[in-house]
Regions:
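A general "mature secreted/periplasmic domain" signal
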Residues: 22-284
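Bacterial Sec-dependent N-terminal signal peptides
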Residues: 1-27
Length: 284
């Protein structure tokens, strides 16, 4: 959870994307949200929030999940009066910016509790920290998920299950790893964790294997269980690694004595990843 407090920087994020005319926004033209010290105001964006600025220390906030922020005044009627402008909050996501003026009210029933950022409240913004938006990752992943398998010889058999690599695609700074599992038992697989690791190749039983766990940038399917079939696409940052290491996708079960199945991918398969045609994003 990220928390902001005592952010005194003036919230002037007036840089528009290339080709747009310069523009200014004043508080009079800004949407206002009424806030109260006993009410949490929750603002939800349509995509991950990358930056938040609260222009004064009169309001505090935090970010419990990646697309949601919470705001609340620090003081009540002893300090604030109805109609006081407490702060301006600036919210920057992957592709747009939004600003709200926060107005104090002493009446809890007037305070905004839940606010969704509407389309007409967004100003397009080319965030330099984001090379690919989550929405675009999802579009690529869905297209890859529906595409035929190009790999036939990378698979693992364990616990009467087969885990196989279907595709590896390279898009910008990311690898898209498409894999599936066939469950030939009658026992449902309740997913505990899906992990991506960089492991040393095992050379002997006495060799100590070093493992580096990688955090996926995006996972297409968040299902918690499957019965006979499972397919998913995960996105990881592009990387290079020596031939004595392998990339491993591991799926484990929730039960204490649960099943675990993993798939090892050689470096040669990773570096031969096909480039995914962006035109496919917009095909229907």
């Amino acid at each position: 959870m990220r928390t902001w407090k005592n952010v005194f920087a003036v919230a002037v994020v007036g840089v528009l994307t290339a080709g747009q005319a310069k523009a200014q926004r004043t508080l009079e033209g800004m949407q206002l949200l009424t806030v109260n010290e006993n009410v949490t105001t929750v603002i939800t964006a349509s995509e991950p929030v990358r930056f938040v600025d609260i222009s004064t220390a009169k309001v505090v906030g935090d970010q419990p999940i990646n697309n949601t922020i919470r705001l609340k005044p620090k003081e009540g009627v002893d300090v604030n009066r109805d109609g006081d402008i407490l702060a301006v909050v600036t919210i920057v996501t992957e592709r747009y910016r939004t600003q709200y003026g926060l107005i104090y009210t002493s009446r809890q029933g007037e305070a905004v509790t839940d606010k969704t950022i509407e389309t007409d409240e967004r100003t397009a913004y080319n965030n330099p920290a984001v090379s690919m938006s989550t929405e675009d990752m999802a579009r690529y992943a869905r297209q890859i998920w529906t595409s035929p398998a190009r790999y036939r010889n990378v698979a693992t058999n364990r616990h009467r299950m087969t885990m196989r690599l279907n595709n590896i695609y390279s898009v910008g700074e990311y690898f898209f790893l498409d894999f599936s599992i066939d469950n030939r038992t009658n026992i449902r697989f309740d997913i505990d964790q899906l992990k991506v690791k960089l492991n040393d190749k095992k050379t002997s039983k006495s060799t100590t294997v070093q493992t580096v766990e990688l955090t996926p940038e995006f996972t297409l399917d968040s299902s918690e269980s499957f019965h006979f079939g499972y397919r998913n696409v995960i996105v990881v940052k592009k990387m290079t690694f020596p031939n004595d290491k392998i990339l491993t996708i591991e799926l484990s079960e929730k039960q204490l004595s649960g099943r675990t199945i993993s798939l090892d991918i050689e470096y040669a398969d990773v570096i031969s990843a096909d480039s995914f045609n962006k035109v496919l994003l917009y095909e229907h």
